[in-house]
Curated annotation (Swiss-Prot):
Record membrane topology: Multi-pass membrane protein
GO BP: lipid A biosynthetic process; lipopolysaccharide biosynthetic process; protein O-linked glycosylation; response to iron(III) ion
Cited HAMAP family: ArnT_transfer
UniProt KW keywords: Cell inner membrane, Cell membrane, Glycosyltransferase, Lipid A biosynthesis, Lipid biosynthesis, Lipid metabolism, Lipopolysaccharide biosynthesis, Membrane, Transferase, Transmembrane, Transmembrane helix
Taxonomy of the source species: Bacteria, Pseudomonadati, Pseudomonadota, Gammaproteobacteria, Pseudomonadales
Function summary: Catalyzes the transfer of the L-Ara4N moiety of the glycolipid undecaprenyl phosphate-alpha-L-Ara4N to lipid A. The modified arabinose is attached to lipid A and is required for resistance to polymyxin and cationic antimicrobial peptides.
Major subcellular location class: membrane
Keyword RNA-binding: no
Pathway the protein acts in: Lipopolysaccharide metabolism; 4-amino-4-deoxy-beta-L-arabinose-lipid A biosynthesis
Organism of origin: Pseudomonas aeruginosa (strain UCBPP-PA14)
InterPro entries membership: ArnT_tfrase, Glyco_trans_39/83, LipidA_mod_glycosyltrf_83
GO molecular function: 4-amino-4-deoxy-L-arabinose transferase activity; mannosyltransferase activity
Protein's name in the database: Undecaprenyl phosphate-alpha-4-amino-4-deoxy-L-arabinose arabinosyl transferase
Subcellular localization: Cell inner membrane
Record-stated family: Belongs to the glycosyltransferase 83 family.
Amino acid sequence: MSRRQTWSLLLIAFGLFYLVPLSNHGLWIPDETRYAQISQAMLLGGDWVSPHFLGLRYFEKPVAGYWMIALGQAVFGENLFGVRIASVVATALSVLLAYLLARRLWRDPRTSLACALLYASFGLIAGQSGYANLDPQFTFWVNLSLVALWYALDAGSRRARLLGWILLGLACGMGFLTKGFLAWLLPVLVALPYMLWQRRWRELLGYGALAVLAALLVCLPWALAVHAREADYWRFFFWHEHIRRFAGEDAQHSRPWWFYLPLLVVACLPWSGLLPSALRQAWHERRQAPVVFLALWLLLPLAFFSLSRGKLPTYIMPCLLPLALLMGHALVQRLRLGNSVALRGNGLLNLGLALLALAALAYLQLRKPVYQEEPFELFLVLLVIGAWAAAGLAQWRYPLRAWAAPLLASWVLIALLPAAMPNHVVQNKTPDLFVAEHLDELTGARHLLSNDLGAASALAWRLRRSDVTLYDTRGELKYGLSYPEHSQRSVPLADIRQWLWRARQDGSVAVLLRINSASDRYQLALLPGDGERYRNGNLVLAILPQVRP
């Protein structure tokens, strides 16, 4: 196959597996609805400086990630595709960086393509590409900063070196505007030991200052603007989002230190079987500069994230590009030597996982059916398992010819699995679809009320309104609700009947509830019995008409 045919086929695969599925399923709560609503509010209200969630101050992240999601909605519409396109573009750009860096490191087209394909099909990377959150964007900026660092260090001229360091600073600045100070820390974690090992610390001091200047030029305009607008922003963002998350006893998502070690293996599926051989080869080549650079990029951020008390699976996404390059390099070396042991092992692993998934599905369907009268969704999940099994079998039987078969497994998974979810999961986790079914009933509502932030943000995004009152919940909006002017945006349980009576005198009230517990059922029981009610799974929508004083 010619190079032109290869790239044409990959572009078709990108459209089919990454772009087409973006509009095939609703927004997942809590992340997708939150980011969709915040960015939509920026687009509609014109405030591009201070992030607001449901009209309340929301200082957990800077603004660039919201800008990109808002740009997607501005260009493609306030729809599922528009909300998610920023993540796909960021992932595609990271894949391109994997290709370019591999080409610069080893100057071999086959290795470059293999590294890019492995990275694009890593389960965690591919899965997040169609999910509207900030991690794919942040990962791209970190990747760009470290690729720029290598280009600067490997430059053959002073001009190229200057451009590399400037690009490093610009990427750090955009990463900071996306997710904060980590965008500065991670490149330093890699650059400092590598340049000390290379005995180039003078270059680090000189050109590093240029990178810092470039980063400041990107960050300072917004940093000063948000400080002028919201004097408390930097205190909250630094202490709550960085210090408390890293070292606080009450850190969110607390996990043991070893949490990321098994997760790293899972994140590499369907290529995890190549990990031992790739790490072994990296150890044998440990004195080579490219391998040292990639190893530092993989291990030092991984160690930093492992030391943090707060951990989420997506935090390690910046560690996966160097791992893909190490694995792709080892893979091509084995293909050239005709060594099929690792490839056969990887194929057997994927085949075993598919058979295990099939057995688990059969067991659940017999004991407590996951799919109830949902033949199409069941067919889709069987198709995913079948593709995974076929890819594993092909790589096991024909390892040197079908080495790329796991690509099919990964891409079929991300394309079909969201649409293959059972109805009870869809009803519980994507409330915007339920809201979309009742837009006519909701459009005339004077007041909106919800007991769940995910449902509230879905309601706000679909109706293009931020004024949803919270019913006996605060959650991550506790800080925004602490401002006196917003104290009435949350109604405690004891006051709900009085609040509803006053609100209904002003116009109709739409109440969207998620019913997951006894306390939620009690919240539902406190609502007046008149009006219209609609139910879908654990979602209840009540339209309470206006009453006379």
